[in-house]
Amino acid sequence: MINISFPDGSVKQFEKNITAFEIAVVISTSLAKAAMIAEINGDLKDLSTQIDNDCRLRILTAKDPECLEVIRHDAAHLTAEAVKELFPETQVTIGPAIENGYYYDFARDKPFTTDDLAVIEAKMHELAKKNEKVTRELWDREKAVEFFKSIGEHYKAEIIASIPSNEPISLYRQGNFIDLCRGPHAPSTGFVKHFKLMKVAGAYWRGDSRNEVLQRIYGTAWATKEQLESYLFMLEEAEKRDHRKLGKELDLFHFQEEAQGMVFWHDKGWSVYNTIEQYIRRKIRKNGYIEVKTPVLVDKSLWELSGHWEKFRDDMFALETDDKTLALKPMNCPCHVQIFKQGIKSYRDLPLRMSEFGLCHRNEASGALHGLMRVRSLVQDDAHIFCAEEQITDETVSFCKLLTEVYKDFGFTDIKVKFSDRPEVRAGSSETWDKAENALKEAVEKAGYSYTLNPGEGAFYGPKLEFVLTDAIGRQWQCGTLQMDFVLPERLDASYVAASGEKKRPVMLHRAILGSLERFIGILIEEYAGRFPLWLAPVQVAIATITSDLNDYALEVQKALIESGVRVDINISPDKINYKIREFSNQKVPMIAVIGKQEKENKQVTIRRLGTTEQEVLSIEQLIEYIREENSKYI
């Protein structure tokens, strides 16, 4: 007999070699009917897995989050089965689950069309309704290679031949379809109910541009109909909010082939950029930071000392001049250490909080570039805090509070924290890591945050915190970071004189709140759907006249607003007032100042706010004072 421990703490005895599914039947027939996979000692397994030793067991259903990836993997196999039935000449390759869905790569001479996707999806529903049994089989390697070659699946044969000889060849069969896979999978195709094929794209075999191009079908799959509909609605909303689309419509920025990954900021976009920089500058000054500016182009010798040349050389832009190799900096930290090293530093100088809006360059692959979200030239709201070990907790708490304030001002209140602790390969002693991790954990808790642990995901030089924002349509964006570093001060010989008179290495805290300004602006455009709040809007007030005889007064209002620092646009053309209002509304201007005969006589304007039909009559002075008050909260 073997002892099986269950999540409720109970322990029951069963005969050896019983399957997880058979145990589910013993527990209840309803559980057995809903069961998808089993978790045995923390590992996900098929329900058909035989258990011959004592273990911890969970029977998982579609309600358990662990099953979502299984559903998506099952959907990938279902897609491949449908394609093979409809287009038997097609070869299958790989089909993993990914975030929010899955994909499957196919080799086929004729490209899949939108109509093909609809037919494939219909076939998938047909196969799912058949509720075909899914079974796992272990094959001999040579037999598996020969089998897949014999049915014309040369890509599968190549994959199997490349699997290490000590690994079993695991195949899954459903209906007439068989695929190479580690699993686990649900016991039948009927568990895949809520899915949709999304698009077709090209993909290189094995991700190598020297290889042939395959056709990648992307799909999404969910546990419930409501989840699928919610996701599709989010995608629809995201398309409307796409920062690339809105950037063009609102005349904020553009990209072009001659400068891939580099932003051409237009006047309005540059206004948003500068306002954010001004806002951050005000915040960091209030929090005791100094601001510096370091070179963009630095000799490779510094990058060799810091270790960046070895690790990031392929992502750096370099050039040869005067028998030297110079590189555009991909990050600011080594340069900040150079400033710290100027002059003798004492413990009284710590903590030293050094910030920079640092212009960095990274040689991203052209295929990875994505509007403002992934660029080659970027500015970070970067800072490095040089401190003593005993100051780590307080500095981290202060940073968390500052970060919370900033995110709140931009409208983000749902913030999640990920804590990445020591990796297997790391610098520094276990004692040093213990201190660092405990200091970060204590600080995060003091700042009022809970966190999820990313075991082993810290950098080799120290643990880190990642701050993740949730936007208006439920997407998550990792923006802020705090990274502890024991190594760089050592490598670049940074030191301070302790109270005892001995020379010590400072701890270096790398921290950013927004990350790259370019990416954060992209996030904001999508968060606000282009409707920037008044303090941030590139045009705060648009002036529109009802008739041309009011133009002189409109220009007078414009002059007064500009002199008061208000960002203004004006339309004194002969166009009708409704057209002017509509045009300014399409440009997402938060306040439209309408000027008619009565407004001119009373030295007033009638304010219409974006998205409402309400109107408010204000004097010029009242309007200026209102905008000043709004601005003063942020900049």
From Swiss-Prot:
InterPro entries: aa-tRNA-synt_IIb, aa-tRNA-synth_II, aa-tRNA-synth_II/BPL/LPL, Anticodon-bd, Anticodon-bd_dom_sf, Beta-grasp_dom_sf, TGS, TGS-like. It is found in: Cytoplasm. Zn(2+) binds at residues 333, 384, 510. GO terms for cellular component: cytoplasm. GO terms for biological process: threonyl-tRNA aminoacylation. GO terms for molecular function: ATP binding; metal ion binding; threonine-tRNA ligase activity; tRNA binding. Residues 1-61 form the TGS domain. Its cofactor is Zn(2+). Residues 242-533 are annotated as: Catalytic. It is an enzyme of class 6 (ligase). It catalyses: tRNA(Thr) + L-threonine + ATP = L-threonyl-tRNA(Thr) + AMP + diphosphate + H(+). Its EC number is 6.1.1.3. Keywords: Aminoacyl-tRNA synthetase, ATP-binding, Cytoplasm, Ligase, Metal-binding, Nucleotide-binding, Protein biosynthesis, RNA-binding, tRNA-binding, Zinc. Binds 1 zinc ion per subunit. Homodimer. Catalyzes the attachment of threonine to tRNA(Thr) in a two-step reaction: L-threonine is first activated by ATP to form Thr-AMP and then transferred to the acceptor end of tRNA(Thr). Also edits incorrectly charged L-seryl-tRNA(Thr). Belongs to the class-II aminoacyl-tRNA synthetase family. This is Threonine--tRNA ligase. It comes from Rickettsia bellii (strain RML369-C). The gene is thrS.
